Amino acid sequence: MAAEGRCDGQTVRRNFQSSDGVRLSFLEAGVEHAAEETTTIAFITGWSMPASLWQKQLAELSPSFYALALDPRGQGESEVPTFGYTAERRATDIHEFLKPFSKVILVGWSLGAIESLQYIQMFGTDRLAGLVLVDSSVGEEPAPGPGGEGGFLKELRKDRDKALTQFIHAIFKTKRSNADLDELVRGAQRLALNDSIALLSYPFPRTHWREITHGFTKPLLYVVTPQFESQAHNLQKNRPGTQIEVFRSAGHALFVDEPERFNRLIEKFAKGLP
């Protein structure tokens, strides 16, 4: 893996090449812990979003942990190829990202959560110490309401710029600067429309994700906003031992809206691992 440069006093950006020849970028912090027997925390971001959204997690967790955040293909600072926008390929990218590490807590947000589940289904759990799923459906009841994702796809096809702008403004409840929001919109526009839609159209039934989640035998933390609260309680009932946490005042990007609370939760989860 090649270093590209420092992003701030703690965080370094690096790149590696996937097995299908794509340059993938990631952020790392706490590199002094990399050679130790400490836990590695790896963050997988959501649809169209960059790894830099995890900046406060990298900064605040790196004094105790080796922390990494991946820019998936087509997102952030990673290359934007014309291929590979399937659950299987994105899970393979995660597998190749995690190859150098062991005792990993994998933290997946939104689309990154189901791609983390696909990684587990394809490659197993040998490298994982625990799993954190953040504000994503996991196939439990109740299913998301009608018109949600399908309606959004229609809006994307109709007026992509407007749909992206509305989506990005809606995922935060804390105030973000217009410059920051505009930068996120521009970043999301790097990916071709059809490829961005493909990422929201994985051809799996809801039971696929539920079965993977139920079959995961290591510690699991499910962190949600109220939209998934009922799923969280059902997962805890159907998969005893699941830890859940509800962020009632945060937006979909809850780790950005309430970083201190989220970081304490991750640190507590990590320190409680067997």
Q: Which sequence ranges carry the predicted segments?
A:
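Catalytic histidine-centered segment of alpha/beta-hydrolase-like enzymes
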Residues: 250-263
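Conserved acidic catalytic loop of the alpha/beta-hydrolase fold
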Residues: 88-104
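Flexible "cap/lid" loop of the alpha/beta hydrolase fold
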Residues: 117-160
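Conserved HGGG/HGGXW glycine-rich cap/lid loop of the alpha/beta-hydrolase fold
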Residues: 22-79
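Conserved alpha/beta-hydrolase catalytic His-Asp/Glu region
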Residues: 142-147, 157-215
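Short beta-strand immediately N-terminal to the catalytic nucleophile in serine-hydrolase-like folds
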Residues: 106-108, 134
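Gly/Ala-rich beta-loop-alpha elbow adjacent to hydrolase catalytic centers
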Residues: 108-116
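Conserved serine/cysteine hydrolase catalytic core
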Residues: 193-246
